[in-house]
Amino acid sequence: MIIFGGVDGTGVWNNDKYAKIFEYSFVRILYNSWTAGPRNYERGPVTADNKLSDYTYFSALRTYRYVLSNWKASESAVFLAGYSRGGAAVIEVAKWLKNKGIPVECLILFDPVDRTGQMGLPWKDTPIADTVKTIVYAKRMKSAKSRESFGNCGLRMWNGERTPYKEFFATHGGLGGVPWTEPKAGGFIDEGPPDFKTRVTVAMDRAGANAVQKWSFDLVMDALLECEERLSEPDGPAKQ
C-alpha cells in the first residue's frame, strides 16, 4: 500500500473556480491517476494565505493526519507532492513524519516556495528531512524572470548540502502544470505586480510545462515501480 498526499499551489478564493484552473495541475494529475493506495488532495492557499480553511499550515496538517491514519508499519510507503506553497507544506509534512518514525519514499516538488510564516523554522525554510529517499524537484530558471519577487524553498538538505533539482524555462505557473494562456498575440507573459513581464511567451510556457511533466512523471513512475517491488518483499520499504 502506497499512500499519496498532494498539496497544490496558490490560487483564487472560490473553490469551484480554483478546481477549474487547477484541473490539470501536476499534483492534481498525480492524485487523479493514483491507484497504488490511499490518496489525498488539498487545494492550495489564496494569495494572502488568509482563508482559514485553506491555510498552508492546515493543508499540511490534514495531509500529515491522512498519512498517519493510513500508515501500517512494514506494509506502507509514502509519496508526497506539492506545488508552490504546497511544496513548502509537504516539505513540512516530511519533517513531521520523521518525528513519528515514518519515512517518505518520494518527495515531489514543483517550484516550491515558502511565502508564509506558518511553515518552516523562524525566518528560515525547513530543510529536506533525511528520511526522504527520492527527491523529484523541478525549479524555474532565473532567466525566465518569473516571480522574481520570491525565491524557492527546500534548496537545502538536512545536512546542509544542496538539494538536487532540475531547472526549466517556464513561469512559476508552468512549473506546476498551470501555464499561462495570455497573451495570445505571442508577446511575453505579464504576471502583474510586483513582477510584471517575464521572458516567457505562452508557447514557451506550454513547452516548459510539458518538459516538466515528462521529466518528473518518468521519475515518479520509476520510484513507484521500485517501491512496489520492494513493498512486495517480506522486509518492505518501511524496514529499509
Set out the residue ranges of the language-model regions.
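Active-site catalytic motif of lipid deacylating hydrolases and related acyltransferases
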Residues: 1-78
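Structural recognition of the beta-strand scaffold that forms the well-ordered cores
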Residues: 3-6, 39-43, 79-81, 106-109, ...
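Short secondary-structure boundary/capping segments
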Residues: 17-25, 54-58, 95-96, 121-127, ...
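Structured segments of extracytoplasmic/periplasmic soluble domains
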Residues: 29-33, 66-70, 93-96, 100, ...
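Serine-dependent carboxylesterase/thioesterase catalytic core
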Residues: 60-154
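C-terminal catalytic-base region of ester-bond hydrolases, centering on the histidine
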Residues: 130, 140-240
